[in-house]
Regions:
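Short secondary-structure boundary/hinge segments and terminal tails
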Residues: 50-51, 99-100, 122
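Residue-level "edge-of-site" marker
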Residues: 45, 94, 117
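Short, conserved charged micro-motifs
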Residues: 27-29, 76-80
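Cationic, histidine-enriched alpha-helical/coil surfaces that engage anionic ligands
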Residues: 109-125
């Protein structure tokens, strides 16, 4: 489970993150429910992770496209991006929800969530 704070202004998506493993997701769902919380967006992705000095490189396959996420120091990210033939002008700072909403609007998809079985066919989830 990950808490993600607000994005700081700048050419890269920088924000506080707190992460922990959840041994029983169903218990967490029940706790959230008892606290009055409801799921408002779900998404699926397949992730492969690689490492470069000081940078974690994640290759994310989602229902709306495949993306590379770089996590690490600014210098490390710029070095890896350059090695991949990319510059800060190529960086996507939007969230997966934002990417999904743009995809859904452009492709007349009515699904509420970014799931592999619903994004392509436009059905609701």
């Amino acid at each position: 489970m990950t808490f993600k704070g607000p994005v700081q202004p700048g050419p890269m998506k920088v924000r506080e993150e707190q992460e922990t493993e959840v041994s029983d997701p169903e218990v967490v769902r029940r706790v959230f429910h008892e606290l009055g919380m409801q799921a408002w967006f779900r998404y699926q992705k397949f992730r492969e992770e690689y490492e470069a000095p000081g940078v974690v490189i994640a290759l994310d396959e989602t229902p709306v496209g495949t993306y590379v996420e770089l996590e690490g120091s600014e210098e490390g990210i710029l070095t890896v991006a350059d090695a991949l033939g990319r510059s800060p002008a190529d960086f996507i700072l939007d969230s997966y929800r934002g990417l999904f909403l743009a995809f859904a609007q452009a492709n007349n998809v009515s699904a509420r969530d970014m799931l592999f079985d619903t994004a392509a066919d436009g059905t609701g989830a």
